[in-house]
From Swiss-Prot:
Residues 292-303 have a biased composition (Basic and acidic residues). Residues 286-311 are annotated as: Disordered. Residues 28-78 form the FHA domain. This is FHA domain-containing protein At4g14490. SUPFAM superfamilies: SMAD/FHA domain (SSF49879). SMART domains: FHA. Disulfide bonds: none annotated. It comes from the Eukaryota. It holds the Pfam family FHA.
């Protein structure tokens, strides 16, 4: 038995005229406030959690939740915490003014759906029986040299459509149409089946034609490749007989076969090292040109400047001479290890040279400051003596 839906109609009270529907399996709590309740009624005699209505084993049940003023069902007081079955037409009274009428609504929507589906299935079965009753032989069609066979297998939908097309070709569609019209009462099904079958057969024939063209192209490619190979072999044999074969081509082929990936990698590395050498040479030449320009510039001379650190000047001159001598060496004849060792010494000396050039003006300034201070002290001492 199907559980009916519940409809609560408010006959009296603050919500008079309202009607609420609830499906089976739902739980309805009634109280004075909205929080925790599905139905809120602003009545002074209703508790915050007054009663509960729910569906239990195919029946709707009401239960009082220990309210202060109690609940009446058909003028009978309900015991708290005990459930009572509801019936169609029962009246629930709670609070000072509120009364609710209970109605059961049976939903026939599902039953209607089932009957419709059953009718559709019955019509489909009738059509299948009509199609199975027609026994046709295997029909073959030849198009572009291909054999296309239509076999009678009623298990698949496409084969049934093919049967209808075959029956049209043999002139049997009249009887089939009459049977379908007698059972269905309209020509729509026959027309739709015919159009779908024609479209399916056209698509299949086009696919077959495409397959045939692709096969032909593949065969042509294979035949042409074989012919070219044979021609190449014949030409090479003829040239060898006449003594016209190029020796250079044979040597290059042998070299390509002998060489391996490791050797090619080594060649690439050597090329990169030569590039690095060229870059280093260019940098060394630029630095040499800069040093020459710096030497050619006139230095500011001071009459009273006297450099006391003669040992440091000797070091700087020695470093410059060593740098010039080392730059004159031919870097292209060096190995990679010798180049790295040369760069280590050369870069360190170049750094020392640059720092000396930066420190030298600072030393001259400090010397002049010291001389100035000593002169001032001498002047002050003479003034004090006077």
């Amino acid at each position: 038995m199907v559980t009916p839906s519940l409809r609560l109609v408010f006959v009296k009270g603050p919500r008079e005229g309202d009607a609420l529907d609830y499906k089976p399996g739902s739980t309805i709590r009634v109280g004075r406030i909205v929080r925790g309740n599905e139905i809120a009624i602003k009545d002074a005699g209703i508790s915050t959690k007054h009663l509960r209505i729910e569906s239990d084993s195919g029946n709707w049940v009401i239960q009082d939740l220990g309210s202060s003023n109690g609940t009446l069902l058909n003028s009978n007081a309900l015991d708290p915490e005990t459930s009572v079955n509801l019936g169609d037409g029962d009246v629930i009274k709670l609070g000072e003014y509120t009364s609710i009428l209970v109605n059961f609504v049976i939903d026939d929507f599902q039953e209607k759906k089932l009957t419709r589906n059953n009718r559709r299935q019955a019509n489909a079965r009738k059509r299948i029986r009509v199609l199975e009753s027609i026994n046709l032989g295997d029909i073959t069609e030849e198009e572009k040299g291909l054999d296309v066979k239509f076999e009678n297998k009623p298990s698949s939908r496409v084969r049934k459509v093919r049967k209808i097309e075959d029956s049209e070709k043999l002139g049997i569609t009249d009887g089939l149409q009459e049977d379908l019209v007698e059972k269905n009462g309209s020509f729509r099904n026959v027309e739709s089946i015919q159009s779908s079958s024609v479209n399916l057969i056209k698509v299949e024939m086009e696919d077959c034609a495409m397959v045939e063209e692709n096969l032909g192209r593949g065969l042509k490619k294979r035949v042409s490749s074989k012919a070219t190979r044979s021609k190449k072999i014949e030409e090479s044999v003829g040239k060898a007989c006449l003594g016209v074969v190029n020796v250079e081509k044979v040597e290059t082929l042998k070299e390509k076969r002998i060489t391996r990936a490791t050797r090619s990698k080594k060649i690439d590395i050597v090329g990169d090292s030569y590039l690095e050498l060229d870059m280093v040479l260019n940098r060394a030449r630029k630095n040499k040109g800069k040093n020459k320009k710096a030497d050619q510039k006139p230095l500011k001379s001071f009459e009273n400047d006297e450099v006391t650190d003669s040992g440091e000047q000797g070091l700087s001159c020695h470093v410059e001479e060593d740098m010039n001598n080392e730059l004159d060496t031919d870097l292209r004849k060096m190995t990679l290890g010798a180049l790295f060792s040369f760069l280590e010494g050369h870069l360190s000396k170049e750094i020392i040279h640059k720092t000396e050039n930066m420190i030298e003006p600072m030393r001259s300034k400090t010397q002049r400051v010291r001389e100035y201070i000593s002169d001032q002290r001498k002047v002050q001492a003479k003034a004090c003596m006077c």
